[in-house]
């Protein structure tokens, strides 16, 4: 092991470097991340600069005149109830000078009063008497009276001709005049003393107004809303990256030594830097464009910076709690908007200070509160400076403190829940771990405590378990005792491991074998510390795996290669290795050397600078293995480390492990039995979670009666029965395994090798009796695995079961596949189109139904949309109270003993009488008002802005004259002062009662209530319209899963794909739109009378708007969806576009042409456009007091029609995109009118050189086949001169893009009834060739022709054929079951429902999928998933089958089932199969011919035996010695007996040689010599086999690795080629 020193600082620096590299290389993502806040900032600055920064200069005092000057002749005053007192009061009112000509009407009830008011708009006022001293005035909302306590933003307006202030409306519109007349009437009725002249002579005066910035309330709300969303892009990408990295890599990195603090520090520091920079930008924008004029840069920057930090912290917290990137984004967005909108109450000054500080625990609320305070100070032209004598600076310091506290709190909670919540690894801390650090994992440790009696359990029977060699006694490195593991499934607990007892030894390679789902990965995950066992214990070098401290020590010595690949796609191979080397704690000075050593030993030097995302699956697997071995860990836990690797790479890894066997513990799982046979010293076989047997290959093969495979090739003259009798005579226990017309295969027992010399000597003499040739090979562990899988009790049972299973499976498959052509009937083109539309619609419904996360996201977004509605209701409720409020003195004036607070001041009384006014002052004091009295000569009341109001008393005693002076910021000052004066006069007349007055603002229609939330219903629709990316971007996930390619190849029409999705998406979306419409209506937020015409127009428009937005989203998905789905980001973009459009339309004068233009240019504005027109028209009727016309105008109809024009346009655009950039269709699309295209053969850029003679012959045959007019003579697949180049990466921005050649002038064809195997190492071009043949990738040059099925649908004149395709990636939907997949593809391929049932049933029977039929794909084991993908490819009656590594990940029995299915396909001589595989045993078992590709070229082609004879005529000899010290002696003896023997692998106790045929033949002499060596040197065993196809491929693969074949094409072709694009 390397010396390790794990430091958080080193890990943090490494992770920071990784993040920066990712940001730099993902330039589009980074540009989007930075551009959104920059655009928001520039928009706010430009908006403010152009139109909104108009400062109102100082307004001098204004004399409004006396009340006598008001002319109320046009007024209609209605009062209730009618009584003697009320009639007297109202009669007195008529004597007021202002009331001359006023009609006064008495009605019995409030309802009657409302009705009279409605019929006398606009000059109607209502009076409701509660008693003789209490009444309320009911006025129309349009009357213009202020209805808020305080206008925070624009209390006065500069109209150029004169200044106008809001509070003057009370005086000028007659409200105060009527109030004063009624007060005078009450006083006269009560005291029989007339004060009408005295009160009506009161003058009204406005104090002077200081300069201020007038802004509409909505301006600041929109400004704050933009500020709240300013960091949205950073939050989006932070949550996405952190959540995905935690899910994919963090736990594996923790196994390798990663500290939690390093992980969070790296992401935290990078985004602290980002927030810092972007906060500087927005602070500069806000201050330089004077959005905020009086507050400095530092305050704005600090406020934004701390708010951004809090959002990053809450993002980390939500990422830990929710563990889903999209859900995290939406919750943070909801959190921001909700609490930010609640913070608007601070802007309205509706919350008590204590509650405001309590709610500041939510950072968006605290931020909105801080912005509101800045706005208040700016409004008063004070600004926030430090220090500030007024104390406002300390309030901002408190806001800064609470934001910093919020950030710290969220971060602490994130780290806490990261410790205690179960995610990824099952090890977690106790909830109160911070109280006692030693208590961490106590529960787990106790539960899995080592039980002494388990340390030495009763060993299983020796019949199944080979005894351990004495040399390994005492070297037990890992001791597993009674390990059990259970998982919670939907149907109950699933037992993965059932009481395993096992020891793993040092200096020994141990392989874990078993079928898919046997428990191999569960065991390895437990040993690595990722999983916690349900019961039992594990010790590693006497350290308990369940103890936290021991686990940390164990992990320092562990290297883990999980089943999934672990790498960072944005990093190169070298950078990945460097990163993990630093995480593991390798000393900085040793990192480079360690990385170079790994690159060299695993032969990755040629791909060291390639990005991981551009590697093939095999190369990614090799990189993951390299990461596991960094630091030379003493314990290697490898879960299928060589899956997907080519033979050469596999041999490299085998050699690597063999060299490190000494003093190391190597435990690996595999589905590749040959790998276990060759590499592992000891095999452990697990079945259904239980241990079946352990031992070496020799033990297992001997135990289960397996040995050599003798293959005899004969002609028609050979008597097979006589030959069998001959063999049984020499080898009595020989068994016939397989028999064909040309070949017999026997199994010769391993213990009979002593009889082989005589047997082969006699067999050589038998060759003249029809025996053409023979070959011998050693049995593999495949046979052992197949026998052990069924758990029979005896060897005889093994033989019977093996024969029965093979015959039954083959019979089932032979019945299943031909039946497909029998049940398929021709259907018409349109019938097939309808079937496909229904199938895709059902697929979309199933995806929506099963994806609970998607539904939760939509519901959450709906909640965000309805959030302002809730706030609107709350605001309306508050306004209902305020609109019915009483004009009390405590609104503006202090009471005796009350400390100055809020808006209240003392009442200033100016004495201008030159006498004592003590009687009046006493009357005021009896109203509980704090007075401040001064003389007129000393104090100018109009300049006393520190007071809310003042009363100037003039005249003489007992005949006072009054002037009411009001601060223009106190909107309700005049009614209050008039009541104060009236009550003062009443008290001076020796009456103790006080007059009380309330105001009730009456709305005659359902109108939008101004609450500070701009057009709530429009906001709802804006958010709903922005939801289309969350609804209609399903195609992006199909593309990511490669499911769309599979559907297209299966014959799906492009139009059926889009229309099938649209049927569901439009229905769902239109339902949401209509719901939001009618929710707004029923919430009484719309000024619209819902007549039948309007309801119809709304429904039509909603359907059209839903269709246009859905198809617009489809276009966006097609163009931009090939990288990431980004539905949340697109929703934000939609929302911003709608908001900006509405802002431009709504803030100007109403213009129908502008609305139409906006609707045409912005499809998502269509629904809002009609709403704006209808609302504004109704509002115009309202303010002009006209009768509402309910009909639809031409503009309304045009607005309803525009979305349908958009829909047709987007469908046409989608059709054009499919035609130009889409995949080539199999059938002619009846709707899009897209026909299969014959690609013109482009000239090949290079000519073939130094080709093998068989390759040249194949090229000529392919050329002749293309020109053959006879269709019956044509092969089923013709690939002529295929050439493919991909664009490489730029080394830097100024360099030219390189061209990488994947396939170089390859020609071959597949005949009817033939299986052609396409073989070669990783990067040889196999998959690229298959994708070109399948039509997924367009060839750079060359031509492909496939056989067409004459009875298939829609092929008249088509140049493309329908075929079955099994891609390398499983293009499946995780939430769909196996049965649903099969039914979907059956419909797409045109099978009628009843036929599909039959076909599916037979295929399920043949491939043993009964138990998985109703299981979702995400719950299937890897083997079952791969099997399903294969079944989908053979479903239907396709003449061509193209299979790209179809058996990858399958266990042995699964592979055999797939092989039998493929053989059944070609049993019909009209069909052909092209097969790509890394499993050379599969190629030998299935392929009639094999084509081997190396470096993009076809190296050789021909029958398997031909290739063996041509390239691999040698034999392989393996000898296993008991005593290692005898190796040199044995080696010399072998060289003496076989002079040309070449030693191959140098492995512990295993000698491997390659022997030429001349040294081996005759076999009788070879076996005679080997028997002598076996007995002379006491060998454990030996085997002699003819060179396999594996060896042939291995030798040819070296050409690619060594660079002897490939040439330079701007770069080394030995490097991995870029992954192919799906674009044609």
Curated annotation (Swiss-Prot):
Which molecular-function annotations from GO does this UniProt entry contain? ABC-type transporter activity; ATP binding; ATP hydrolysis activity
- What keywords tag this UniProt record? ATP-binding, Glycoprotein, Golgi apparatus, Membrane, Nucleotide-binding, Repeat, Translocase, Transmembrane, Transmembrane helix, Transport
Q: Which residues bind ATP 1?
A: 514-521
* Enzyme nomenclature, EC number: 7.6.2.-
User: Would I find Glycoprotein among this entry's keywords?
Assistant: yes
Name any GO cellular component annotation: nucleoplasm
Q: Where in the cell is it found?
A: Golgi apparatus membrane
Q: What is its main location?
A: Golgi
Q: How does it sit in the membrane?
A: Multi-pass membrane protein
Organism's domain of life?
Eukaryota
Q: Where is the ABC transporter domain?
A: 478-713, 1282-1520
- Which positions are glycosylated? 84, 91, 576
Question: Where is it made, tissue-wise?
Answer: Widely expressed with higher expression in heart, lung, brain, spleen and testis.
Binding, ATP 2: 1320-1327
* CDD domains reported in the protein's UniProt record: ABC_subfamily_A (cd03263)
List all membrane-crossing ranges.
31-51, 222-242, 267-287, 297-317, 326-346, 356-376, 395-415, 854-874, 971-991, 1005-1025, 1058-1078, 1094-1114, 1130-1150, 1154-1174, 1194-1214
**Function per UniProt:** Probable transporter which may play a role in macrophage lipid transport and homeostasis.
Similarity field: Belongs to the ABC transporter superfamily. ABCA family.
- Can you name this protein? ATP-binding cassette sub-family A member 6
């Amino acid at each position: 092991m390397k010396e390790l020193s794990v430091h958080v600082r080193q890990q943090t620096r490494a992770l920071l470097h990784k993040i920066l590299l990712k940001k730099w290389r993902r330039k589009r993502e980074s540009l989007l991340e930075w551009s959104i806040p920059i655009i928001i900032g520039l928009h706010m600055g430009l908006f403010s600069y152009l139109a909104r920064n108009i400062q109102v200069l100082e307004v001098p005092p204004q004399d409004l005149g006396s009340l006598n000057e008001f002319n109320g002749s046009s007024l209609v005053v209605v009062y209730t109830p009618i009584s003697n007192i009320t009639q007297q009061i109202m009669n007195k009112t008529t004597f007021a000078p202002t009331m001359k000509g006023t009609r006064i009407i008495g009605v019995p009830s409030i309802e009657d009063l409302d009705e009279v008011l409605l019929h006398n708009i606009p000059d109607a006022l209502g009076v409701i008497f509660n008693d003789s001293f209490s009444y309320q005035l009911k006025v129309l909302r349009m009357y213009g009276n202020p209805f808020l306590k305080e206008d925070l933003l624009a209390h006065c307006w500069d109209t150029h001709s004169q200044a106008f202030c809001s509070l003057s409306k009370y005086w000028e519109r007659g409200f105060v005049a009527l109030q004063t007349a009624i007060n005078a009437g009450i006083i006269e009725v009560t005291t029989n003393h007339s004060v009408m002249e005295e009160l009506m002579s009161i003058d009204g005066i406005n104090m002077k107004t200081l300069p201020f910035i007038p802004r509409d309330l909505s301006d600041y709300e929109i400004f704050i809303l933009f500020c709240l969303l300013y960091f949205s892009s950073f939050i989006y990408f932070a949550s996405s990256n952190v959540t995905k990295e935690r899910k994919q890599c963090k736990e594996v990195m923790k196994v390798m030594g990663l500290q939690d603090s390093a992980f969070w520090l790296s992401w935290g520091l990078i985004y602290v830097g980002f927030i810092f920079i972007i906060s500087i930008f927005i602070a500069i924008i806000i201050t330089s464009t004077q959005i905020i004029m009086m507050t400095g840069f530092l305050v704005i920057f600090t406020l934004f910076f701390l708010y951004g930090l809090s959002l990053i912290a809450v993002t980390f917290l939500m990422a830990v709690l929710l563990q889903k990137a999209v859900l995290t984004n939406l919750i943070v967005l909801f959190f921001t908007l909700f609490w930010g909108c609640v913070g608007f109450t601070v802007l309205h000054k509706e919350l008590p200070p204590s509650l405001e500080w309590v709610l500041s625990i939510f950072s968006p609320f605290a931020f909105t509160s801080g912005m509101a305070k800045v706005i208040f100070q700016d409004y008063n032209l004070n600004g926030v400076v430090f220090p500030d004598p007024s104390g406002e600076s300390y309030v901002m310091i408190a806001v800064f403190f609470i934001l910093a506290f919020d950030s710290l709190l969220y971060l602490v909670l994130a780290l806490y829940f990261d410790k205690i919540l179960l995610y990824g690894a099952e090890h977690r801390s106790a909830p109160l771990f911070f109280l006692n650090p030693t208590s961490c994992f106590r529960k787990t440790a106790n539960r899995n405590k080592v039980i002494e009696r388990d340390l030495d359990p009763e060993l299983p029977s020796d019949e199944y378990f080979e005894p351990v060699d004495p040399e390994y006694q005492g070297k037990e490195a890992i001791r597993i005792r009674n390990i059990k593991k259970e998982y919670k499934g939907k149907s109950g607990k699933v037992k993965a491991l059932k009481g395993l007892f096992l020891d793993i030894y040092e200096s020994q390679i141990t392989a874990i074998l078993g079928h898919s789902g046997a428990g191999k990965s569960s065991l390895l995950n437990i040993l690595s510390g990722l999983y916690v066992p349900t019961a039992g214990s594990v010790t590693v070098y006497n350290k308990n795996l369940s103890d936290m401290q021991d686990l940390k020590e164990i992990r320092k010595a562990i290297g883990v290669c999980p089943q999934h690949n672990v790498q960072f796609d944005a990093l190169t191979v070298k950078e990945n290795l460097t990163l993990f080397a630093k995480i593991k704690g390798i000393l900085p000075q040793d990192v480079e050397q360690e990385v170079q050593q790994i690159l060299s030993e695993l032969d990755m030097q040629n791909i060291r600078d390639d990005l991981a995302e551009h590697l093939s699956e095999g190369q990614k697997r090799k990189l993951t293995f390299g990461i596991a071995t960094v630091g030379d860990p003493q314990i290697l836990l490898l879960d299928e480390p060589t899956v997907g690797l080519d033979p050469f790479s596999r041999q490299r890894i085998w050699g690597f492990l063999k060299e490190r066997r000494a003093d190391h513990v190597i435990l690996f799982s595999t589905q590749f039995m040959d790998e276990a046979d060759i590499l592992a010293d000891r095999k452990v076989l697990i079945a259904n979670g239980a241990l079946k047997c352990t031992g070496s290959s020799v033990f297992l093969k001997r135990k289960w009666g397996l040995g050599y495979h003798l293959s005899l090739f004969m002609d028609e003259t050979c008597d097979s029965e006589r030959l069998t009798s001959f063999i049984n005579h020499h080898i009595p226990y020989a068994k016939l395994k397989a028999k064909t017309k040309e070949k017999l295969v026997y199994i010769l027992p391993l213990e009979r090798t002593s009889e082989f010399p005589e047997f082969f000597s006699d067999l050589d003499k038998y060759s003249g009796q029809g025996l053409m040739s023979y070959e011998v090979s050693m049995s593999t562990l495949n046979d052992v695995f197949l026998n052990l899988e069924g758990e029979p009790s005896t060897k005889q049972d093994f033989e019977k079961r093996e024969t029965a299973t093979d015959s039954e499976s083959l019979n089932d498959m032979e019945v299943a596949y031909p039946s497909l052509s029998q049940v398929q009937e021709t259907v018409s083109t349109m019938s097939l189109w309808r079937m496909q539309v229904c199938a895709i619609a059902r697929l979309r419904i199933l995806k929506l139904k099963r994806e609970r996360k998607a539904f939760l996201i939509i519901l959450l977004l709906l909640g965000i949309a309805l959030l302002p509605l809730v706030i609107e209701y709350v605001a309306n409720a508050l306004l209902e109270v305020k609109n019915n409020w009483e004009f009390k003195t405590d609104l503006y004036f202090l009471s005796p003993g009350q400390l100055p607070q809020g808006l209240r001041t003392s009442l200033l009384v100016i004495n201008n009488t030159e006498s004592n006014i003590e009687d009046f002052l006493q009357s005021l004091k009896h109203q509980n008002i704090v007075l401040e009295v001064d003389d007129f000569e000393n104090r100018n009341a109009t300049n006393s802005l520190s007071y809310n109001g003042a009363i100037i008393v003039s005249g003489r005693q007992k005949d006072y004259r009054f002037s009411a002076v009001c601060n223009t910021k106190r909107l309700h000052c005049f009614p209050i002062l008039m009541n104060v004066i009236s009550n003062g006069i009443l008290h001076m007349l020796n009456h103790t009662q006080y007059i009380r007055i309330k105001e009730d603002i009456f709305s005659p229609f359902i109108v939008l209530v101004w609450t500070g939330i701009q057009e709530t219903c429009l906001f709802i629709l804006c958010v709903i319209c922005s939801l289309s990316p969350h609804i209609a971007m399903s195609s992006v996930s199909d593309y990511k899963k490669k499911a769309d390619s599979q559907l297209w190849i299966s014959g799906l029409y492009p139009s059926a794909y889009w229309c099938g999705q649209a049927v569901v998406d439009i229905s769902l979306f239109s339902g949401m739109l209509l719901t939001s419409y009618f929710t707004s209506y029923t919430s009484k937020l719309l000024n619209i009378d819902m007549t039948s015409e309007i309801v119809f127009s709304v429904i039509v428009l909603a359907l059209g708007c839903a269709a246009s937005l859905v198809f617009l989203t489809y276009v966006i998905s097609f163009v931009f969806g090939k990288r990431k789905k980004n539905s949340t980001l697109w929703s934000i973009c939609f929302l911003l576009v709608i908001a900006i459009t509405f802002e431009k339309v709504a803030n100007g004068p109403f213009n129908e042409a502008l609305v139409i233009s906006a609707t045409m240019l912005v499809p998502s504005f269509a629904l809002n456009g009609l709403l704006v027109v209808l609302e504004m028209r109704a509002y115009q009727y309202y303010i002009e007091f006209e009768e509402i016309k309910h009909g639809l105008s031409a503009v309304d109809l045009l607005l309803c029609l525009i979305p349908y024009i958009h829909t047709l346009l987007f469908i046409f655009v989608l059709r054009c995109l499919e035609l130009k950039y889409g995949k080539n269709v199999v059938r002619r699309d009846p709707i899009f009118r897209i026909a299969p295209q014959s690609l013109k053969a482009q000239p090949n850029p290079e000519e073939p050189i130094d080709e093998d003679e068989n390759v040249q012959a194949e090229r000529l045959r392919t050329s002749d086949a293309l020109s053959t007019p006879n269709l019956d003579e044509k092969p089923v697949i013709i690939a002529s001169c295929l050439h493919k180049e991909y664009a490489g990466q730029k080394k830097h921005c100024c360099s030219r893009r390189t061209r990488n050649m994947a396939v170089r002038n390859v020609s071959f064809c597949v005949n009817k009834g033939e299986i052609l195997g396409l073989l070669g190492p990783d990067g040889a071009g196999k998959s690229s060739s298959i994708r070109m043949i399948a039509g997924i990738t367009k060839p750079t040059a060359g031509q492909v022709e496939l056989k067409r099925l004459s009875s298939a649908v829609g092929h008249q004149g088509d140049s493309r054929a329908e075929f079955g395709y099994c891609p390398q990636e499983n293009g499946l939907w995780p939430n769909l079951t196996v049965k649903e997949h099969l039914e979907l593809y059956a419909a797409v391929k045109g099978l009628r429902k009843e036929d599909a049932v039959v076909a599916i049933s037979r295929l399920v029977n043949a491939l043993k999928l009964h138990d998985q039929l109703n299981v979702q794909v995400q719950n299937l084991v890897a083997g079952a998933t791969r099997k399903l993908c294969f079944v989908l490819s053979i479903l239907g009656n396709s003449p061509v089958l193209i299979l790209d590594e179809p058996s990858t990940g399958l266990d042995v029995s699964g592979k055999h089932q797939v092989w039998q299915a493929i053989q059944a396909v070609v049993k019909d001589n009209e069909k052909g199969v092209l097969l790509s595989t890394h499993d050379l045993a599969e190629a030998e078992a299935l392929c009639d011919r094999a084509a081997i590709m190396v470096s993009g070229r076809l190296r050789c082609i021909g029958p398997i035996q031909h290739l063996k004879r041509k390239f691999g005529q040698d034999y392989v000899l393996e000898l296993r010695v008991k005593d290692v010290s005898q190796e040199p002696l044995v080696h010399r003896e072998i060289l003496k007996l076989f002079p040309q023997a070449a030693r191959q692998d140098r492995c512990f106790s295993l000698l491997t040689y390659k022997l030429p045929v001349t040294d081996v033949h005759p076999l009788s002499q070879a076996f005679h010599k080997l028997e002598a060596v076996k007995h002379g040197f006491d060998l454990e065993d030996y085997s002699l086999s003819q060179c396999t196809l594996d060896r042939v491929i291995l030798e040819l693969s070296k050409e690619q690795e060594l660079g002897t074949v490939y040439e330079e094409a701007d770069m080394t072709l030995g490097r991995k080629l870029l992954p192919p694009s799906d674009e044609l």
